[in-house]
A protein has these predicted regions:
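Bacterial Sec-dependent N-terminal signal peptides
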Residues: 1-20
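His/Glu-rich zincin catalytic helix
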Residues: 20-61, 173, 476, 481-483, ...
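Hydrophobic/aromatic-rich, well-ordered segments within soluble, folded domains that form packed cores
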Residues: 25-46, 180-200, 567, 574-579
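Active-site-surrounding "flap" and adjacent substrate/cofactor-binding loops of secreted or lumenal enzymes
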Residues: 31-34, 39-105
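Short secondary-structure subsegments characteristic of cysteine-rich extracellular domains
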Residues: 53-75, 207-226, 498-504, 602-606
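Short, glycine/acidic-rich hinge or "gate" loops at secondary-structure transitions
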Residues: 54, 83-92, 205-215, 231-237, ...
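Intrinsically disordered, low-complexity linker/terminal regions across diverse proteins
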Residues: 64, 251-254, 274, 278, ...
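Noncatalytic, helix-rich "gating/capping" subdomain that lines the substrate-entry/channel surface
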Residues: 78-371, 375
């Protein structure tokens, strides 16, 4: 199911002892006001090279490694137990682990698990056959259809689900097809090389593989250039085009929607739908009508191989890693057990989550964090009420939305329980299992949600995920268990550090409810305008300052951040820091703190914030983030975010002569 959520790529370190470690992290040869990133964590950056298994390092990667071990420990309880009842949680975990770890059988089979489907594609003789097979295999998870049909939330009534129609086929963002920059061109070249090699690995000659790859890419390119670009796709109104089932059949008659619906076993009583992006979908119609049957077969074969390459032999996984190495700069493939842990966590996330919570997350942690969230919520309300540019009526609606936010902490109050429909059979290979899983879960979703009220209190992230998010359609903020326990959050530590780290993250998620996307949704999660026209104009003026400022930040020579694409996340950081600092000040009035190791409480707040984002990164991965992520690179979440915050200037006595100084009237004060 499609969920619109805004997540912050988080990084946490133990708060215990953080203040004592600040001095060791510093590069005191640099003034705080000249380069705060280098000042605050320069020595840490120097002493912490990147692990070869990762494209970056930092607190987030450290926690990912620790979490990997925790989840692996849960899995190991079932790894050797082959006599558990079929369908039980332990049986599913153990069986999937053994299938993933059985390199002998997987290498012996090679690409045999997908061979029946490749034969089906290769035997196609006519366009009609191609359309039929395209729909049938797409329903089995092979992504052979450059179009899609599935459940999504109704943007205007988010307590209900509806059917949405979307294009497929283009695996990269629109910019990679339209006007790719140097780094994007390199990624395209790496992907085309991967595609060709995959086609050779399933028995095609070098010449045939080259022809088939070029045919596939021609289709992908035609669709890709018609997509919304990354800035446009952030506007929810640009992806809403309601129609009826009957009108869909007339407007997009180049696609056999009835056959596709039936292949998916989707409900037959579809009335209203949303066509997310009509233009690329019309291009799909043209592609299906104008492309030769042989080229359509090439497209389908490549998509079929790519969709299940992770479940074939080592050769496919190794080649996929070489692609990842080229585009991210990672140097070593993760060992098989880590890849197995990730796969189990992806496919049995709720099952693992229940075990994770029981083992690692006490109820007391949930209550402590809840109190902290309410503290931040009050600080946000204080700032809203102090706001001088909003009218009282819009301000009142903003406060109402803030306090209507549903708060998920640690784990959901009610589990979705969709994984009970997953059946893992050890007498079948991984491909057969995952084909069945996709079909079973899709059918279960239709049974549970079609024409029935939707529970917006569901948590869109599993408890074991080290992250957090805001969901506009739910108006909910979500903090999984993995980030809310020692060493991620330490309620006994210096609260100046806690507010600077986890506090800014809580504030970040709350601020997403009022960023340039989130502000378009009302307190109930519906896409309804609640702003006065003059208020919205003033808001846009303020956020424009932030967008223009971040667009000046150069990540690599000639490669700058796109301030419009990253605006939502930058508003989140701007608001998150402001709100967390206000909450910190409120606490400071009640419980005064002294200096520690020469740092004031305010300085510790900002040093903790910088330490959260401290990371080394490969040039390739840095380029990938700038080109395809809505988050700004970590360095700019410090050096570009903090110059907009008045209290940072006060904490470190930043002067007009300092390099990072921005005049007060030029700073972006949003929330």
């Amino acid at each position: 199911m499609k969920k619109l959520m805004m997540a912050v790529a988080l990084a946490f370190v133990s708060m215990a002892g953080m203040a004592q470690n600040f001095r060791a992290n510093l590069d005191e040869s640099v003034k705080p006001g000249d380069d705060f990133w280098q000042y605050a964590v320069g020595n840490w950056l120097k002493n912490n090279p990147i692990d070869k298994e990762y494209p970056m390092n930092g607190a987030f990667i450290d926690l990912e490694k620790a979490n990997e071990l925790r989840i692996n420990a849960l899995i190991m309880k079932y790894a050797d137990k082959k006599d558990l009842p079929q369908g039980s949680d332990g049986q599913k975990i153990g069986a999937l682990y053994r299938l993933l770890m059985d390199s002998v059988s997987r290498n012996k089979m090679g690409y045999e698990p997908i061979m029946p489907y490749l034969k089906q594609i290769r035997s196609i003789k006519t366009r009609e056959e191609a359309m039929k097979v395209m729909a049938e295999l797409d329903a089995k998870g092979f992504n052979t259809a450059p179009y899609g049909l599935g459940l999504s939330l109704n943007p205007f009534n988010s307590s209900t689900l509806m059917m949405s129609v979307r294009h497929g086929g283009a695996s990269l963002a629109q910019e990679y097809y339209a006007e790719p920059n140097e780094q994007q061109q390199a990624e395209v070249a790496a992907k085309k090389s991967l595609y060709k090699d995959f086609l050779k690995m399933v028995g095609n000659s070098d010449a045939d593989a080259e022809r088939m790859m070029q045919a596939e890419w021609a289709i992908e390119h035609r669709i890709g250039v018609k997509k919304l670009n990354q800035v446009e796709s952030r506007d929810p109104m640009k992806t809403i085009h309601f129609t009826t089932w009957e009108q869909l059949l007339k407007d997009f008659k180049g696609i056999d929607w009835v056959a596709y619906r039936d292949a998916l076993n989707a409900p037959k009583d579809i009335d209203t739908l949303n066509v997310e992006q009509p233009e690329p979908l019309h291009e799909v119609e043209k592609v299906l009508a104008e492309t030769s049957v042989d080229d359509l077969k090439a497209y389908m074969e490549l998509k079929a191989v790519y969709s299940y390459c992770d479940y074939l032999n080592d050769a496919f996984e190794d080649r996929l890693f070489e692609y990842r190495k080229a585009v991210s700069g990672v140097q070593e493939q993760k060992p098989r057990w880590k890849r197995a842990v990730a796969e189990i966590d992806d496919n049995l996330s709720e099952t693992i989550g229940k075990l994770y919570v029981a083992e690692y997350f006490p109820e007391t942690s949930k209550q402590r964090v809840y109190r902290l969230v309410k503290d931040l919520q009050q600080a946000f309300e204080d700032r809203l009420k102090d706001n001088t540019w909003m009218s009282d009526s819009t301000k009142a609606k903003a406060v109402e939305k803030l306090h209507t936010m549903y708060i998920n902490i640690g784990y959901p109050d009610k589990w979705e329980d969709m994984e009970k429909f997953i059946d893992i059979r050890e007498d079948q290979n991984l491909v057969e299992n995952f084909i069945r899983i996709k079909q079973e879960v899709r059918a279960a979703n239709y049974r549970k949600y079609w024409r029935k009220p939707f529970n917006k209190k569901l948590m869109p992230m599993p408890p074991q995920m080290v992250n957090a998010c805001y969901v506009p359609n739910f108006n909910s903020i979500n903090f999984p268990a993995a980030i809310l326990q020692p060493p991620f959050f330490d309620p006994e530590a210096d609260y100046a550090c806690n507010y600077g780290a986890v506090g800014t993250v809580i504030g970040h998620e709350m601020s997403h409810g009022f960023d340039d996307e989130g502000c378009q949704f009302d307190k109930d999660g519906n896409l309804v305008n609640w702003w006065g026209a003059e208020d919205k104009a003033k808001y846009d003026e303020r956020t424009k300052v932030l967008a223009e400022w971040f667009s000046e930040q150069e990540a690599l020579p000639g490669l700058k951040v796109n301030g419009e694409k990253t605006l939502g996340e930058n508003i989140g950081d701007n608001g998150g820091i402001q709100v967390a600092y206000r909450a910190f000040e409120n606490r400071l009035k009640q419980e005064p703190l002294g200096d520690v190791d020469g740092f004031t409480p305010a300085q510790r707040f900002y040093l903790a914030y910088a330490r959260v984002w401290a990371s080394n990164i490969t040039p390739e991965f840095l380029a990938l983030i700038v080109n395809s992520d809505v988050h700004s690179p970590n360095i700019f979440r410090v050096n570009a975010a903090l110059p907009m915050i008045d209290s940072w200037y006060d904490a470190f006595n930043i002067q007009p002569t300092d390099k990072m100084f921005i005049p007060k009237d030029k700073r972006a004060l949003v929330w």
